[in-house]
From Swiss-Prot:
One matching Pfam family: GTP_EFTU
Keyword annotations from UniProtKB, A to Z: Cytoplasm, GTP-binding, Initiation factor, Nucleotide-binding, Protein biosynthesis
The tr-type G domain, residue ranges: 417-586
Organism superkingdom: Bacteria
Stretches the record annotates as Disordered: 1-296
Lineage: Bacteria, Pseudomonadati, Pseudomonadota, Alphaproteobacteria, Hyphomicrobiales
GO CC, any one term: cytosol
Organism per entry: Bradyrhizobium sp. (strain ORS 278)
Compositional bias per record (Basic and acidic residues), positions renumbered to this chain: 117-183
Family annotation (PROSITE patterns): G_TR_2, IF2
The protein's name in its UniProt record: Translation initiation factor IF-2
């Protein structure tokens, strides 16, 4: 270019010849060898870019240094000339004339704008510094990640290189071991001219630009044979040439040459990176018989467009080699967490461990136990096997399905006060239900059969002063209802012991005291019937001292209140004492959780189905909840209060009737709400299974010990009175069964074929017919079809409303099965004076009656020398050849015995009568 440019000369000078870039392509020809002596000449083109001196691979990017944001540059100078500001704050123009004076507002606005600008400047600077710091951290993390990836890549390449080296050594060793014919000859000293490929750089920085096209091309395999070096039927042990070499990379450009037998071959790169000289071309010679074996014919070789496919035999040999390597490789042991129940079969245990059942059985055999895969082993043995095989064990039990149902600890911050639960207990006819009626302003006594309580009931009463609700549970006082009283004491907070002032402490009063002590709940004594003229409350307090109940008036800590249910005297004070005791107990619970409760009573209602009276103790029971109680489950269809109102939910200490069970649960079962039906089915199936196992164990256990065998021998001849019992509620049925069980003796006992809740059905009649049993209905009736079937088959059905009438009738019927008692009544004695032998009659003894009377047909004993030699009946009694009915003392008569004639003079005959006396239980 000239030193000076002419402004008007803009013409571009173009040389006479167009400039072009010469393609840097290196070409050459190589000969590619194929199995079975075939070869092909190909042309290889190598394209790439030349490296300039000083070029190098770009260095890895470095994280920039954290930059500190600089303050923005000052604003450009104003076009107006800047002059000194006048002292008066006036701005002057170019001529020095004051244009306008700034007001105070404008000056304050300008100062505020400057302050805001400084704040923004500081904020932007801080954000820039934060962004620079984050960018530096991010780039440092990326750099560390790249370095780790590069290290992994290098390790992977090194591993692949070692694997290829080991594989190549193994193939060479196999070639030496299994090769046939002469050894390969050394390569010629003067190799054929080939296209020399540049050696591969060790690392990426030495690689030229355009790396994908600049790698050395590998056409032949590393073990390409020199001419005639391999036997006719042998193949090289290295990789096949058609695969592009061991690295599996295709050549940059391969074109088939016109002549397949001429031309040089490419230099092959070894695993270490150094170039090896290509072997000399194959020499053409006449193949011998061994060279010809296993090769293609000339026509097939000339007509083939591609290399020959792999033979089946070669594929099989390779498969066998791979199988051998796989067998030699030790598999990694899989350690599993094995869940072991209480009992498990060997096959199932092996499946859970992913082991062979044969190995498990072999392990058991080493321990001296012979088993089959279908045998059941216990959890301890299964745990030993699993740990021996290197697995971890998780022991589970069938009872785990009940975990989390009850007694879940609540957070103290979620609790709130609840109403107290009070159980009223006492002896029969001491006024428990009447006292509750007076508190509830109701009349339950008139609804009970016989005026006695035979059901457990739960009610809620509101205290008049505080307005708090108190839940009362009324229990029967009769001896037959012990289980009911015990159940009431378990779910209660306070026990109110009702004692009649005119009757004092009675047996069921003592039992109620024991129940309260066993439940460890406080007690309040209500001395009832103080309105009677013969009431003596002081005697009641004194009698309670004998049973370790010391009231406050006698220096104790038990509260006592004198009340009258008839006149409603001191009822307010009784409620006040109950509320005071509840405040002392500080009763709290969590209502915002799934409900828990206790089944107080259960029955089978004909119109509503199974109905259970439930006392909710924790949480809230809602309509639609899935509930479990004992071996029964269901979904809550309705909640009915003690007043008959339908509720949507019931909180703690609220008694409700629950509808929706599949069957009536047993009284005393705990109720819980579960999350779904699947969990409910698991719990109920487990409990039903436990109940069946317990029943089977009780039956099989009766044959266990020697004492049980002796008791069975005693009861082997015991008579049984079969019964089918149906009751209205579970509690009454429980009381009936307990009372009938007490009636049994060693000679006779009641056999309960079936006991259930609900009306009498046809199936009950059919069952009773099969065992010739009686049917008893307590507060229930048989339906029309069952009554007709019982009448047709002669099955007796008896109905009762009072439990004592039922027990008395069954007792009388069972007494009829007892064997009667035989009692002897002495009539008289006679002495034999002479023995006569009469032809048609036999021997007849002539006797004199010494005392009493001898009657014909009475029982006699023949005594000889104070030893009884015969017992029988008197068949003939005559006096002077006349048959007489009896003979008095001092008279003589003739006697003959039935089927006996060995009578001697001097023998004594005792005459007695046997009386049959009917026994009773």
């Amino acid at each position: 270019m000239a030193d000076q440019n002419t402004p008007g000369d803009k013409k571009l000078g173009v040389p006479s010849k167009t400039l072009t870039l010469k393609p840097r392509v290196e070409t050459g020809t190589v000969r590619q060898s194929f199995p079975h002596g075939r070869s092909k000449q190909v042309v290889v083109e190598k394209r790439g870019t030349k490296r300039r001196v000083g070029d190098g691979a770009p260095d890895a990017p470095h994280a920039p240094e954290p930059t500190v944001a600089k303050a923005p540059p000052p604003p450009p100078p104003s076009n107006r000339p800047s002059g000194p500001r006048p002292s008066g704050g006036q701005q002057r123009g170019g001529s020095g004339v004051v244009l306008r004076t700034l007001t105070e507002d404008e000056r304050s606005a300008r100062a505020s704008a400057l302050a805001d600008a400084r704040v923004r400047d500081l904020e932007e600077r801080r954000q820039a510094e934060e962004e620079a710091r984050r960018r530096a951290e991010r780039e440092a993390a990326e750099r560390a990640e790249r370095e780790a990836a590069e290290a992994r890549r290098k390790a992977e390449e090194e591993r692949h290189r070692h694997e290829e080296e080991a594989k190549r050594k193994a193939e060479l060793e196999a070639k030496k071991r299994f090769g046939e014919g002469e050894a390969p000859r050394p390569a010629a000293a003067a190799p054929q001219p080939t296209v020399s490929a540049p050696a591969r750089p060790a690392q990426a920085p030495g690689r030229p630009q355009g790396a994908p096209g600049s790698r050395p091309q590998q056409i032949g395999g590393p073990s390409s044979r020199p001419g005639g070096s391999q036997p006719g039927g042998a193949r090289p042990a290295g990789p096949r040439p058609a695969g592009g070499g061991p690295l599996g990379r295709a050549p940059a450009a391969v074109a088939a040459g016109p002549d397949e037998d001429e031309g040089p071959r490419q230099i092959r790169r070894g695993p270490g990176g150094a170039a090896r000289p290509a072997p000399p071309p194959k020499t053409t010679h006449k193949p011998g018989p061994q060279k010809q074996r296993g090769r293609l014919t000339v026509v097939t070789a000339l007509n083939a467009d591609d290399v020959r496919e792999r033979s089946i035999a070669s594929f099989r040999r390779r498969t066998q080699r791979l199988k051998g390597h796989a067998a030699n490789e030790q598999k990694e042991k899989l350690v599993r967490e094995v869940t072991i129940p209480e009992a498990i079969t060997i096959q199932e245990l092996a499946n859970r461990m992913s082991e062979r059942a044969v190995d498990v059985i072999r392990l058991l055999m080493r321990q001296g136990a012979m088993h089959k895969i279908t045998d059941v082993i216990d959890a301890d043995t299964a745990q030993l096997i699993a740990e021996e095989l290197g697995h971890t064990v998780k022991r589970v039990a069938a009872s785990d399905v009940e975990e989390g149902l009850f007694d879940v600890v609540d957070d103290s911050t979620d609790t709130e006060p609840r109403s107290p639960v009070v159980t009223v207990m006492g002896h029969v006819d001491h006024g428990k239900t009447s006292l509750l009626d007076a508190l509830r302003h109701a009349n339950v006594v008139s609804g009970e059969a016989g005026g006695i309580t035979q059901h457990i009931g739960a009610y809620q009463v509101t205290a008049p002063d505080s307005g708090k609700k108190i839940t009362f549970i009324d229990t029967p006082g009769h001896a037959a209802f012990t289980a009911m009283r015990a159940r009431g004491a378990k779910v209660t907070d306070i026990v109110v012991l009702v004692v009649a002032a005119d009757d004092g402490v009675m047996p069921q009063t003592i039992e109620a005291i024991n129940h309260a002590k066993a439940a460890k709940v406080p007690m309040i004594v209500a001395i009832n019937k103080i309105d009677k003229p013969d009431a003596r409350p002081e005697r009641v307090r004194t009698e309670l001292l004998q049973h370790e109940v010391q009231v406050e008036s006698l220096g104790g800590d038990v509260v006592d209140v004198e009340v009258s249910a008839k006149n409603k005297t001191n009822l307010d004070r009784l409620l006040e004492m109950i509320a005071l005791q509840a405040d002392i107990l500080d009763l709290k619970t969590n209502s915002d959780r799934p409900a828990e409760g206790t089944v107080i009573e259960a029955k089978l209602d004909r119109g509503r189905g199974p109905v259970a009276t439930v006392l909710v103790q924790r949480g809230t029971l809602r309509v639609g909840d899935i509930i479990v109680a004992g071996a029964e489950m269901g979904r809550v269809r309705a909640l009915i209060s003690d007043q008959g109102e339908t509720l949507q939910e019931a909180g703690p200490s609220v008694p409700v009737e629950v509808l929706g069970f599949n069957g009536p649960p047993e009284a005393g079962d705990r109720l819980a709400v579960v999350e779904n039906e699947a969990r409910a089915r698991q719990v109920t199936s487990y409990r039903a299974h436990q109940k069946r196992e317990n029943a089977a164990a009780s039956i099989s256990g009766m044959r266990g010990s020697l004492e049980q065998m002796m008791s069975q021998l005693k009861t082997a001849g015991r008579k049984e009175f079969p019964l089918v019992i149906k009751a209205d509620v579970q509690g009454s049925l429980e009381a009936i069964l307990g009372s009938l069980e007490k009636l049994g003796t060693e000679e006779v006992a009641a056999r309960i074929l079936h006991a259930g809740v609900g009306g009498i059905s046809e199936s009950d009649v059919t069952l009773a017919e099969g065992f010739n049993a009686a049917i008893i209905g307590f507060s229930v009736r048989a339906n029309k079809e069952a009554a007709a079937l019982a009448k047709r088959n002669g099955i007796e059905i008896r109905y009762y409303n009072i439990i004592y009438d039922l027990v008395d009738d069954v007792k009388k019927a069972m007494s009829g099965l007892l064997a009667p008692t035989l009692r002897e009544t002495m009539l008289g004695n006679a002495q034999i004076l002479e023995v006569f032998n009469i032809s048609k009659v036999g021997k007849v003894a002539g006797c004199r009656v010494t005392d009493g009377t001898v009657e014909r047909g009475a029982n006699v004993r023949l005594i000889r020398d104070n030893v009884v030699v015969h017992e029988g009946k008197l068949s003939t009694l005559k006096r002077f050849k006349d048959e007489v009915k009896d003979v008095q003392a001092g008279q003589e008569c003739g006697m003959a015995f039935e089927n006996y004639g060995d009578m001697r003079v001097g023998d004594v005959i005792e005459c007695y009568r046997v009386e049959t006396i009917q026994r009773s239980l």
